[in-house]
Curated annotation (Swiss-Prot):
The active site is at C152. It comes from Mus musculus. Residues 60-207 form the Tyrosine-protein phosphatase domain. Keywords: Cytoplasm, Golgi apparatus, Hydrolase, Nucleus, Protein phosphatase. This is Dual specificity protein phosphatase 26. Belongs to the protein-tyrosine phosphatase family. Non-receptor class dual specificity subfamily. One of its GO terms (molecular function) is protein serine/threonine phosphatase activity. Brain and skeletal muscle. In the brain it is expressed ubiquitously except in the hippocampus. It holds the Pfam family DSPc.
Length: 211
């Protein structure tokens, strides 16, 4: 379980015991390989939730989900000693606001900072930040020795959504492939609104490849 994530615990409980049927879209049985591919004609938010609640659900304050790319929480972002130990050169904060996250917080560490003022709400349009965030991550990982922490409050929804978008935009992963890749290392739960936006990105990218 992600540190301090009471919401994760309650949602996992509901996923396991609600509806009382093996047809529940968020059941926890089965392996990732049994999940539908992105080309499945009925792939939707509910199928993605099945995938998200299958397999690895644990996470630490930060987990390396791609070489040099750490997905984590606010506690890790505030831990200067650990950031220095990991060799973090860039921080992308997906929960930036006037009280949480400033470039000045990393003075003396040589860390470059990007803040995204996003709300963990299904109604929030995270897609407007997909390209900017992906570009920032790409620049961080392109420099010699570059390592980036992408975080929000808990590190499972807002920041995870931006990491998934990065893998899709820069590494041509399908959404399902991106989710599987991240879940090999960290449990994530983007909210339904973010999943819909990622599905829209996935369809747009696939249409571009097929054109």
């Amino acid at each position: 379980m992600c540190p301090g994530n009471w919401l994760w615990a309650s949602m996992t409980f509901m996923a396991r015991f609600s509806r009382g049927s093996s047809r529940s879209p968020v059941r926890t049985r089965g392996s990732l390989e049994e999940m539908p591919s992105v080309h499945h004609p009925f792939l939707n938010v509910f199928e993605l939730e099945r995938l998200l609640y299958t397999g690895k659900t644990a996470c630490n304050h930060a987990d390396e989900v791609w070489p040099g790319l750490y997905l984590g929480d606010q506690d890790m972002a505030n831990n200067r000693r650990e950031l220095r130990r990991l060799g973090i050169t860039h921080v992308l904060n997906a929960s930036h606001n006037r009280w949480r996250g400033t470039p000045e917080a990393y003075e003396g560490l040589g860390i470059r900072y990007l803040g995204v003022e996003a709300h963990d709400s299904p109604a929030f349009d995270m897609s407007i930040h997909f390209q900017t965030a992906a570009d920032f991550i790409h620049r961080a990982l392109s420099q010699p020795g570059g390592k980036i922490l992408v975080h929000c409050a808990v590190g499972v929804s807002r920041s995870a959504t931006l990491v998934l978008a990065y893998l899709m935009l820069y590494h041509h992963f399908t959404l399902v492939e991106a989710i599987k890749k991240v879940k090999d290392h960290r449990g994530i739960t983007p909210n339904r609104g973010f999943l819909r936006q990622l599905l829209a990105l996935d369809r747009r990218l696939r249409q571009g490849l097929e054109a």
